[in-house]
Amino acid sequence: MTAISGASIGAVNAMLYSMNDMERMYQAWNEIDMDTVFDIDLNMLAEKRMYFSRNEMLAMFEKYIDMEKIKADFRDIYVSISRLNETQQPEQVEYRRLEDYDADTIRKILLASTALPVMYEAVEIDGKKYRDGGLLDNEPIQPLYDLGIRQFIVIGMRAGKVLNTEKWLDAQFITIYPSHDLGDLIDGTLNFTGRAKEFRQMLGEKDALRALKTKFHPDDLYIRMEPVLAQNDYNDIMMQLRVNYTYKTMENRVNSNIEKFNNIAKKYENL
């Protein structure tokens, strides 16, 4: 892989992926929760700035993303951001090559590319305001195409999407989209509960494994069976989630009862 690009949360994934440490990437996503996404800053409330804070997200960047290592090891990482006009509406997509910027500016670019309207404040970079790159280009192919790249792996979040490749007729594309719907903005994009994260991780792994035989190393028989295999994988995931939920529920009950017994024992110790 010679270059990578991303928009919105895909920009964060691009940075994590370029660290070439899958365990680190897995840990980062396990740590992100609803408090990370919906972080409330009392100072912002006092100033009547009705947005969620980005402090928790910045802390995640600091913990898991080594800006200097990425710049040294992986030069061509592009992030799309949406420039706002005077009425604060997105008017122009910009593609930023992160190697060209210092660490502080890279953080701003990542915050801008993940700044969803209504939820987060627009981010100012060089005197201009920017928001989520996905508003204008959620699959930033163009900057890599301009580098001369003609073979692409496109990973998206919309189930059943068919990529429009009319702008890049001389390029080849392998696309991987979810085999099942991930939900809308509220119950999908912004859902970082443990169960939702676990479902997306498991579905992504299953979809990627099937893609190896349907797109990277095509097997005609496997391709014909793919819809059935996808449904079987989905059923397996839902069963595993139910098992995990049952186990965690039982574990919590046992721990709660042990705590009660310990408290009772302590009372008798003092008699």
Region locations from a protein language model:
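Patatin-like phospholipase
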Residues: M1-A7, M15-L271
